[in-house]
UniProtKB/Swiss-Prot annotation:
Miscellaneous note of the record: The porphobilinogen subunits are added to the dipyrromethane group.
Family affiliation: Belongs to the HMBS family.
Function: Tetrapolymerization of the monopyrrole PBG into the hydroxymethylbilane pre-uroporphyrinogen in several discrete steps.
InterPro entries xrefs: HemC, Porphobilin_deaminase_cofac_BS, Porphobilin_deaminase_N, Porphobilinogen_deaminase_C, Porphobilinogen_deaminase_C_sf
Cofactor binding, per record: Binds 1 dipyrromethane group covalently.
This protein's name: Probable porphobilinogen deaminase
S-(dipyrrolylmethanemethyl)cysteine PTM sites in chain numbering: 241
Gene that encodes the chain: hemC
Gene Ontology biological-process entries: protoporphyrinogen IX biosynthetic process
Coiled-coil annotated residue ranges, if any: none
EC number: 2.5.1.61
Length: 296
């Protein structure tokens, strides 16, 4: 049997897709896959920060439309790119094993957040990253930086930036253990990641129950539990890419530990929530963050 898989065409997207498809093939070895590459709004518009594009789901909308139109059977995404409300008719059903969810400080000299020189130029087009950086180091100069991972790394190495903040998961998946530039993980307390970072997710039509069942059987259980908490947080807090909110769940033997935060105007507010039910833990964390947002 052949499954048509819609995905973006970047090198990292294709690597992530193959990672998730390998999990599926481990469950159903006889399945074959056909990759359907789709261009998204986020791929086509490279000269603006994401929050200025003004379109929800800039990296996922067109990919999911391919599934709804019958041009593909399933779609593969970075979970962090999926909005909390999926297009009606689609189901979020599959999760890869999670790569490190942290953001990382990328620089030729291997700077940490503490050792960055005063006034250093740090590249990011993320409101979340920019606001948390300002809260930790108000002396830094934050400049927009977009493009695929290779493009951003090249701009840092060329001296246009002293450092940049990027997802550790993308760097690991793209370069393995030999990145072309040092990357120092940032503690989630310093820079809470976006919900879903490090997890690759699969979307299929709700009516295609055979495929959604297969995706659930192939899913990593730990990643699925953490995703449930983070998706509940995302839906409850209602923040898009224009708000500096982050939230990350960690499954432990005792249950779910959730770290979330909000930053604005050089100040940040962090919360920690613990519990057994992922959805409830995510919602409680969101309510605490929402209270902090109202006070600023």
């Amino acid at each position: 049997m052949k499954i048509r898989v819609a995905t973006r065409g970047s090198k990292l997207s294709l690597i992530q897709t193959e990672e998730l498809l390998a999990q599926i093939k481990a469950v159903e070895p006889d399945i074959r896959f056909e990759i359907v590459v789709v261009k998204t709004t986020g791929d086509l518009i490279q000269d603006k920060p994401l929050f200025q594009i003004g379109v929800k789901g800039v990296f996922e909308k067109e990919v999911n439309l391919a599934v709804l139109r019958g041009e593909a059977d399933m779609a593969v995404h970075s979970l962090k790119d999926l909005p909390s409300d999926l297009t009606p008719g689609l189901a979020l059903a599959g999760y890869s094993r999670r790569a490190p969810p942290n953001d990382a400080l990328v620089s030729p000299r291997g700077y940490t957040l503490e050792t960055l020189p005063r006034g250093a130029v740090v590249g990011t087009s993320s409101v979340r990253r920019a606001e948390f950086l300002k809260a930790a180091r108000p002396d830094l100069e934050i400049k927009p930086l977009r493009g695929n991972v290779d493009t951003r790394v090249a701009k840092i190495l060329s001296g246009q930036y002293d450092a940049a903040v990027m997802a550790a998961a993308g760097l690991q998946r793209l370069y393995g253990g030999a990145p072309p530039i040092p990357a120092v993980p940032l503690a989630v307390e310093d820079l809470p990641p976006p919900p879903g970072q490090g997890i690759v997710a699969a979307v299929a039509r709700e009516e295609d129950t055979w495929l959604t069942d297969l995706l659930r059987r192939a899913s990593d259980r730990k990643a699925a539990a953490e995703a449930a908490a983070e998706r509940a947080f995302l839906a409850e807090v209602g923040a898009g890419c224009h708000v500096a909110v982050g939230g990350i769940a960690r499954q432990t033997p005792a249950g779910i530990e959730f770290t979330a935060g909000y930053a604005q105007g050089g100040r940040k507010h962090l919360v920690k929530v613990y519990g057994e039910d992922p959805t409830e833990v995510g919602r409680r964390a969101a309510r605490l963050v929402a209270q902090a947002m109202k006070k600023t």
